[in-house]
Amino acid sequence: MQRPGEPGAARFGPPEGCADHRPHRYRSFMIEEILTEPPGPKGAAPAAAAAAAGELLKFGVQALLAARPFHSHLAVLKAEQAAVFKFPLAPLGCSGLSSALLAAGPGLPGAAGAPHLPLELQLRGKLEAAGPGEPGTKAKKGRRSRTVFTELQLMGLEKRFEKQKYLSTPDRIDLAESLGLSQLQVKTWYQNRRMKWKKIVLQGGGLESPTKPKGRPKKNSIPTSEQLTEQERAKDAEKPAEVPGEPSDRSRED
């Protein structure tokens, strides 16, 4: 039987080159000694620590919190500033700015691999690119076409206007239905016709307008049929009456 000390005896210990996995023996039961890591083999600790630190810095919170070198920060800032100042600030109507933004701005048409631009320049480019015909813009309201009345409709309106300068709602409805027009068309025509009538009255020697400032008729501004007949009788009475025995002007001339 061979003893462990003899040359041919079998060795049950760890092979050479392998780490010793024997449990660490504590000298005391102090908390500081328990929490401290056991000392590793000489020379392997610095390399393992550096490798572990490198792996931790690739991913996770450590990578975000790790401080980057100052020179790399400075290089990135200089590159961004150079990319920004390639495009000068100009008003929105400048065509050169719109072409530059469309060629190099990300998010704009034709921007492939170009450096990013500030938000202000991107918004300016999009505002310039938007044309007036796009759905985002509001279209102007077109003017209403002017109503073309027929001769029969004009005759009916004029005939009614001679009798009645102002129409009530029932009268307007009846007139519109009889002439084949809408109430709005009749109302508009009456308003324009009254304005023309007021100008004619003022130009004919009238000192005051036949209507009030708000458009309401004044009292006795529109003569009635009875007043018209009385005026005709007064004009006939002013003419000189012919004497039966005297010859007329025509007979004297003969």
UniProtKB/Swiss-Prot annotation:
Region feature (Disordered): 1-20, 204-254
Keywords annotated in UniProt: DNA-binding, Homeobox, Nucleus, Transcription, Transcription regulation
Main location: nucleus
Ranges of the DNA-binding region feature: 142-201
Top-level taxon of origin: Eukaryota
Disulfide bonds: none
PANTHER family: BARX HOMEOBOX 1, HOMEO BOX HB9 LIKE A-RELATED
Family: Belongs to the BAR homeobox family.
UniProt name for this protein: Homeobox protein BarH-like 1
Gene, per the UniProt record: BARX1
